């Protein structure tokens, strides 16, 4: 019995021990993942070297592009738009790098790759903010109804036509087969227009200001709408929609779009108004460096906040730029006004140049999947979708507009539907599976962008001259006097509406007592503008003029005392 009891006791102990061990094993917490990636010294050094080479390569490309733009201005090659020249240079550089890699002299494959995250976080926000900040708000708000109709409903029409056409052609085995959400995502991203070359030609030939603003205003809002539509399609792709009907899918997509559009616009507007109140009641005009720093913070703030709460940072930063230009800008000192305007233009120019250069480089930088039928049908659908967007909506708007959109203007608006950097970056950002689908979308997008920029952009000026839509004064000019350099125009001018200096009495006499102000313009002049902007006193104006005069004299003294200064140079400056 004793032996049996001992044996039983041992079995119980073993069983309990096994159970406790198993229990302990089950409840043992998993080790926490390291916050920072674990890297060896060699890996960290290699990553630093790769990042350094990427920065060097990007700056090298940018420097070469700046020299190219300078040569265009110096030798008055104004017939060639800068975007076309930079894309062409990128193609040449990409071919040169490909030859070097083939000879095994160097391998810059990692450095020449365009990273979509870098585009959306660093390059796109300054471009969008500057377009809103430098917007001619008078013409924009006078045509806000037409611009909104083209940019929102027109972009949606184009996206549905392109996406639906690709889907049904794929189901008919005419082209590569994509599912509904992938087709709509591609239709949305390829509907973003970027008429940089066209706007430059419009400015050079002095076309109708209404036509100029309709095309320019549509392109500004259209970019944000296209990004929101693409994000909507991506959101539907990530969710399991197999048990949801088509009508429910449409309602869900519509709700997501409305939330993104109006929520982001409201966030950007609110941020801009807060910045106006902050700089109105906190007087930083005597310290321009602090004032400028505060403006830069408020410029990027809505983008980060919107992205952090799952809204559209691009839409938020666009509306923030428009509001800050309309209210906050007038609370700044004259020095910071000029500094802000020129800094934004410089940064936007560098970002645009980087994007167009890497667009040309991308032809050789990643593997492509080319299908002739898919490319041809996509180009046809893009042109057809643009036509269905422009012509019916223009005829509809003419019932309500005093300044009618003529058939010639409609045709130019259709022809100016160039595609640019945003479709290219969005195509690389899509997480499509399998990989060949992503390569097909990327390759097709690059071909469409190059087709529209080089062919449509290059053919806009001959078309305008052919149909005679340019201003009569511009028609008398010699072709050599036509200037398509956006950089030269921006460098030679300061927007007069951004440097207005009005006292309280002058503002009341000029705006509030005007009888022709209606609707929002009257509300803005009567209540909003006085509430959000600082009305200057005569003492403030006097101090601002002294500050500008002091800085100008200081600059002139530094130039005159420079190592290459001479009497002839002084006479030239005078």
Curated annotation (Swiss-Prot):
One of its GO terms (cellular component) is Golgi membrane. The chain crosses the membrane at residues 53-73, 77-97, 116-136, 149-169, 184-204, 254-274, 304-324, 347-367, 373-393, 410-430, 444-464. InterPro entries: Cation/H_exchanger_CPA1 (IPR018422), Cation/H_exchanger_TM (IPR006153), NaH_exchanger (IPR004709). This is Sodium/hydrogen exchanger 8. Pfam families: Na_H_Exchanger. Keywords: Antiport, Golgi apparatus, Ion transport, Membrane, Sodium, Sodium transport, Transmembrane, Transmembrane helix, Transport. Involved in pH regulation to eliminate acids generated by active metabolism or to counter adverse environmental conditions. Major proton extruding system driven by the inward sodium ion chemical gradient. Plays an important role in signal transduction. It comes from Gallus gallus (Chicken). One of its GO terms (biological process) is regulation of intracellular pH. GO terms for molecular function: potassium:proton antiporter activity; sodium:proton antiporter activity. The keyword Zinc does not apply. It is found in: Golgi apparatus membrane. Belongs to the monovalent cation:proton antiporter 1 (CPA1) transporter (TC 2.A.36) family. It comes from the Eukaryota. Its main location: Golgi. It is a multi-pass membrane protein. The keyword Transport applies.
């Amino acid at each position: 019995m004793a032996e049996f009891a001992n044996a039983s006791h041992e079995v119980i102990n073993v069983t309990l021990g096994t159970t406790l061990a198993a229990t302990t094993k089950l409840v043992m917490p998993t080790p926490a993942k390291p916050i920072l990636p674990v890297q060896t010294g060699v890996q960290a050094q290699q990553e630093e070297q790769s990042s350094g080479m990427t920065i060097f390569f990007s700056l090298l490309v940018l420097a070469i592009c700046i020299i190219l733009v300078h040569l265009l201005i110096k030798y008055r090659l104004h017939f060639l738009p800068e975007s076309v020249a930079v894309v062409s240079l990128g193609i040449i550089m990409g071919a040169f790098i490909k030859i070097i890699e083939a000879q095994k002299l160097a391998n810059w494959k990692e450095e020449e790759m365009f990273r979509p995250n870098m585009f959306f976080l660093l390059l796109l926000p300054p471009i969008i903010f500057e377009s809103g900040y430098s917007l001619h708000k008078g013409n924009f708000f006078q045509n806000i109804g037409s611009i909104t109709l083209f940019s929102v409903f027109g972009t949606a029409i184009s996206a549905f036509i392109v996406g639906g056409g690709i889907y049904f052609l794929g189901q008919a085995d005419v082209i590569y087969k994509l599912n509904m959400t992938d087709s709509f995502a591609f239709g949305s991203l390829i509907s973003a227009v970027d008429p940089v070359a066209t706007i430059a030609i419009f400015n050079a030939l002095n076309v109708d200001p209404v036509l100029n603003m309709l095309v320019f205003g549509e392109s500004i809002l259209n970019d944000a709408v296209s990004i929101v539509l693409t994000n909507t399609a991506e959101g539907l792709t990530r969710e399991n929609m197999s048990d949801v009907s088509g009508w429910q899918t449409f309602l869900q997509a519509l709700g997501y779009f409305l939330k993104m559009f109006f929520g982001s616009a409201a966030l950007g507007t609110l941020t801009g108004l807060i910045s106006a109140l902050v700089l109105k009641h906190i007087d930083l005009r005597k310290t321009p460096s602090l004032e400028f720093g505060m403006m830069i913070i408020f410029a990027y703030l809505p983008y980060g906040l919107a992205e952090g709460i799952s809204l559209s940072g691009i839409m938020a930063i666009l509306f923030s730029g428009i509001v800050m230009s309309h209210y906050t800008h007038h609370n700044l000192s004259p020095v910071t006004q000029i500094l802000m305007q020129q800094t934004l233009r410089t940064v936007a120019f560098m970002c645009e140049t980087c994007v167009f250069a890497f667009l040309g480089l991308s032809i050789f930088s990643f593997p492509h999947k080319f299908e002739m039928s898919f490319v041809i049908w996509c180009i046809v659908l893009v042109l057809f979708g643009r036509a269905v967007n422009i012509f019916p909506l223009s005829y509809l708007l003419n019932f309500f507009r005093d300044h009618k959109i003529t058939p010639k203007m409609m045709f130019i608006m259709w022809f100016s539907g160039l595609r640019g950097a945003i479709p290219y970056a969005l195509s690389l950002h899509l997480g499509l599976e399998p990989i060949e689908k992503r390569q097909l979308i990327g390759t097709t997008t690059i071909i469409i962008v190059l087709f529209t920029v080089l062919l449509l952009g290059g053919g806009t000026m001959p078309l305008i001259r052919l149909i005679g839509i340019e201003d009569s004064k511009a028609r008398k000019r010699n072709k050599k006097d036509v200037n398509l350099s956006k950089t030269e125009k921006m460098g030679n001018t300061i927007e007069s509406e951004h440097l207005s200096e009005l006292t309280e009495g002058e503002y009341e006499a000029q705006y509030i007592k005007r009888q022709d102000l209606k609707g929002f313009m009257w509300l803005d002049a009567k209540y909003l503008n006085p509430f959000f902007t600082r009305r200057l006193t005569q003492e403030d104006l006097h101090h601002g003029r002294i500050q500008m005069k002091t800085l100008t004299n200081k600059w002139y003294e530094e130039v005159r005392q420079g190592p290459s200064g001479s009497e002839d140079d002084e006479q030239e400056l005078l």
